[in-house]
From Swiss-Prot:
Role of this protein: May play a role in cellular stress response.
JmjC domain: residues covered: 124-288
Gene that produces this protein: Hspbap1
Principal location listed in the UniProt entry: cytoplasm
S-S bridge residues: none
Subunit and interaction comment: Interacts with CRYAB and HSPB1.
Keyword terms: Cytoplasm
Descriptive protein name: HSPB1-associated protein 1
Length: 483
């Protein structure tokens, strides 16, 4: 049964493990769950891990009582199937209470209140990215109702989490997160996730306009792509899954995702888990910030906010951006120094000789999650089953098709799961070739009509592959001054 406006759908759980005294037992210890998260390189769903969390009862109606009339900001978007993504800069915003949201969403006869200008059949509403520390600043006791420590992160709770409340059709445009990996607990209603692996980045046409620190957007509406404008998207390998109440989705580092609400009301809680790679990623983000702000401000100094995502409230002056970059570089070197000291302590304790210091610091070239031994990766994959369900490719079709809804992968009782593909996708240099493949002019006069905009230039300058190389060169160059 789908979750309606009032209640919460029954969680889709498989057979629970029962202890000697008949009490339910979680399928993974915190240590094992963390090991899986840190080694797994494809999205997966954890089942039977949150059945005792107090926050499993956090329906929108319950939260409206907890928040006691507190106003929150809702992003308002148009329902529709256009081929252009609805970025946050294209949406309007409403400040309202959860009670007012529920009245508009569930009692469409109401024509008063802050949502009165938004016809329910034409618009969706989304209270997204609501950080607990702000939303519950005077009710910090609720932090303890979210227990991420069950996944192997001691002390992690709601304080490091964000809340998402949406109506049917509410969605986030396709993007990747620059930092960390992601754990998402579905509380009420269902959400469909469209995911693409990091190696598909060239096929997703990445852009940093609108600019938001730590988010790389795709130019494509992945649920209705314009394949004439973005033909490479057909090569992207879509993974699709419907997340139901009681399930926790693990999204590995740098996996692209588009998320849409399928039920009248959806509530989700997530937490981004910090990773070793974030130290270099902060340098990349600081480089991106400086380049985007410099060029866009020079292009239109009188309207500096039009290219910024509404979530960006920081000053964008060159002085501030220079401070960001220098802070990120210093933090990277500080982290390396601490890591080196720990390594020396371990070597000393084991009676081993320390390695000879290289002249220049080597920066890891590979993208993707932390390097993990092949044995650990294979062990994580071997744990797939009713309590750890892999998110597999939606179909043999590529990005342009939407066949093979992943509800086949996650059944209503969580007991059935899709088979793993027999062979992993071969990771060749096709991504790089797609990025650099020249496009032939479409006609004899095509050259004279070409116009290169600032955004076109930025799409090249701050492409994730380019900023990674720039960050590596910067770190290697400054390492001469440091070591």
């Amino acid at each position: 049964m789908a979750a309606g406006c009032e209640g919460i759908a029954p969680p889709t759980l498989g057979e629970r493990t029962v202890g000697e005294e008949g009490e339910p037992v979680k399928p993974f210890t915190p240590e094992k769950a963390k090991e899986i998260i840190m080694s797994l390189q494809q999205p997966a769903i954890f089942c039977n891990m949150v059945f005792d969390w107090p926050s499993r009862h956090w329906t929108a109606k319950h939260l409206s009582k907890v928040l006691e009339g507190k106003q929150i900001r809702f992003r308002m978007g148009l329902r529709g199937t256009g081929t252009v993504p609805q970025y946050e800069t294209e949406c309007s915003y409403v400040d309202a209470t959860l009670e007012e949201f529920l009245t508009w969403n569930c009692d469409q006869s109401s024509i008063s209140g802050p949502f009165k200008d938004y016809e329910h059949s034409k618009f969706w509403a989304y209270a997204d990215y609501k950080y607990f520390v702000t939303l519950f600043e005077d009710k910090t006791d609720v932090f303890q109702e979210v227990v991420w420590s069950d996944f192997g992160f001691p002390g992690r709770n709601g304080q490091e989490s964000t809340l998402w409340i949406g109506s049917f059709g509410a969605h986030t445009p396709c993007h990747l997160d620059s930092y960390g990996c992601n754990l998402v607990f579905q509380v009420q209603g269902r959400k469909r996730w469209h995911l693409f692996p990091p190696e598909d980045t060239p096929f997703l046409y990445p852009t940093r306009i609108p600019y938001e620190e730590s988010s790389v957007f795709s130019k494509i509406n992945v649920v209705n792509p314009d394949l004439k404008c973005f033909p490479q998207f057909q090569k992207a390998r879509r993974h699709m899954v419907t997340l139901s109440p009681g399930q926790v989705l693990f999204v590995p580092r740098h996996w692209w995702h588009y998320v849409e609400s399928l039920d009248p009301v959806t509530v989700s809680i997530n937490s981004w888990i910090e990773l070793e790679e974030d130290h270099l990623a902060r340098v990349e983000e600081a480089i991106t910030r400086m380049l985007v702000c410099t060029l866009k401000t020079a292009e239109d100094p009188h309207h500096p906010r039009t290219w910024l995502n509404p979530t960006e409230v920081e000053e964008t002056s060159h002085e501030v951006n220079s401070c960001y970059l220098n802070s990120a570089v210093c933090a990277f070197f500080d982290h390396c120094e601490k890591a080196k000291a720990v390594e020396l302590q371990v070597l000393s304790a084991n009676g081993a000789e320390p390695r000879v210091q290289e002249e220049h610091m080597e920066v890891e070239q590979a993208q993707g999650p932390s390097l993990t031994s092949r044995a650990e990766k294979q062990e994580a994959v071997s744990l797939f089953g009713p309590d750890l369900i892999p998110v597999t490719p939606a179909s043999e079709e590529r990005g342009g098709a939407l066949e093979g809804d992943s509800e086949e992968s996650v059944s209503s009782n969580g007991g059935h799961f899709a088979e793993l593909p027999c062979a992993r996708r071969q990771q060749t240099s096709k991504g790089a070739s797609a990025l650099t493949e020249p496009l032939a002019p479409r006609g004899p006069m095509a050259h004279s009509r070409v116009f290169v905009s600032t955004d076109d230039l930025l799409d090249c300058l701050v492409n994730p592959q380019v900023t990674r190389m720039v960050a590596q060169l910067l770190i290697q160059g400054k390492s001469c001054d440091t070591f």
